[in-house]
Structure formats: C-alpha cells, structure tokens
C-alpha cells in the first residue's frame, strides 16, 4: 500500500474499533478520552508512517465528534 494513498474511513473506524476492544478487554470505561489515549499510545509504539497517520486521523475524528463538526 502506498503511503501517499488517502486514508479510507474504514481504516479510521477499524483503529477506533481496535482501541475500543482493548478498553473493554481490560475493563476500562469506553469513553472518547480513553479511546484517544489508547490511539495515542498505539501511535507512539508504531513504527509505520502510514499507521501513525491512520491513528492520528482517528484521534482527530474523535475530537471533532466530541466538539462538534465545525
């Protein structure tokens, strides 16, 4: 997959879904704040530029949904 290729919405939703699964499996509350923390931790641990982009966009998506689509 080309790194310059546009990130698909499915990739963002998958990243959020994986973060949700992590929170549920470990007994943490499923909140937007916790999701953003998990996505940030995954971003820090990731070494793949494309995955970092997907995770960053997923955090931005959650932030927009929390604060409204301005």
Annotate each language-model stretch with its function:
Residues 1-29:
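N-terminal acidic leader/helix
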Residues 1-3, 67-70:
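Short acidic DE-rich linear segments
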Residues 34-67:
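Short, charge-rich amphipathic interface segments used for partner binding and complex assembly
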């Amino acid at each position: 997959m080309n790194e310059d290729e546009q990130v698909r919405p499915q990739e963002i939703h998958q990243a959020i879904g994986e973060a949700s699964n992590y929170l549920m499996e470990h007994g943490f509350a499923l909140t937007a704040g916790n999701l953003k923390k998990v996505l940030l931790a995954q971003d820090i641990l990731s070494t793949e530029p494309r995955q970092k982009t997907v995770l960053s966009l997923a955090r931005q998506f959650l932030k927009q949904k929390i604060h409204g689509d301005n």
